[in-house]
Amino acid sequence: MQSLLRLLQDGQFHSGEELGAAIGVSRAAIWKRLQALESEFDLQIHKVRGRGYRLEMPLSLLAADLIAASCSYPVTLLQQVDSTNAEALRRLSSGATPPLLVIAEQQTAGRGRRGRRWASPFGENLYYSLLLRVSGGMRQLEGLSLVVGLALLDALREAGVNEAGLKWPNDLLVGGRKIAGILLELSGDPADVCHVVLGIGVNINMRVAPSGDAIDQPWTSLRQILGEQVDRNQFVTSLTRQLERYLDMHRLRGFASLREQWEESHLWQGCLVSLAAGSQAIKGRVLGVDDTGALRLEVEGREQVFSGGELSLRLHDDS
């Protein structure tokens, strides 16, 4: 069905005869494949007698060859998967050798931090998981998710989203709305040799939340901000290049060398916040982060430091 999708991705009308001739199948077979696209990927296809078929909106489909040409590690592009992070870990368990990159057009069980569901409609956003082998102990993991945030921030700015900023520990926001998130998952002993999946989700061309997905926080996308469809292959290429650059800096010099840069882009630097840790809510003012990426808060006149995990940060005056 991939060949049919590539013909339809321009959002223009195509007759059944034209589509069948291009793919080498009958018009009846085209009809069946169109029905399968609608049911499997929840795509809306308009059917107009005398004009043919078109997608409700154009798509920017990912192309494995274009992505692989700009990437220094193996790339797997899937049409649909439960979770790219889960798939990367399955491949590790099956004997795959990192580094490797898993990308999907759609996730059926995409997830974010703290078990939250990540809306993952077909062909609209980016679902990206990079599996790495990490040696050298905890130093190589310190601040890693924040470093990924810096790479993602540069990729967004390169795409024209200059207002994007960071929210500790793993979110990127524009105008108070979430545009991207990061989920790191470990396998093995972090004190010795382990593997880490850098999971990245970016709202690229999403215009409305997919049916059945109630997104529990304000969100935006590159398309909404820029007012036009974004080439997702170009964005993947940019993100991968930035990731390689920042990961090299982190490996050689640690997060401490990037701490000031991260703080300069932290949207809530100096703000009054509420930090939820289980049933406990801690109110304080953001001082920044330390050399390990932990959050520094001034709480009742004293500095306290908090690491990631199941912590949730919001502005103090948020309802």
Question: Predicted segment positions?
Answer:
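Long, positively charged amphipathic alpha-helical accessory segments at protein N-termini or as interdomain linkers
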Residues: M1-S26, K32-R33, G136-A164, V174-S319
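Short loop/edge segments at beta-strand edges and connector loops
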Residues: Q79, L166-W168
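N-terminal lobe of the biotin/lipoate ligase/transferase fold
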Residues: M1-R157, K178, V230
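Short, ordered beta-strand-loop transition motifs
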Residues: K47-R49, K167, V289
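Conserved active-site carboxylates
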Residues: D171
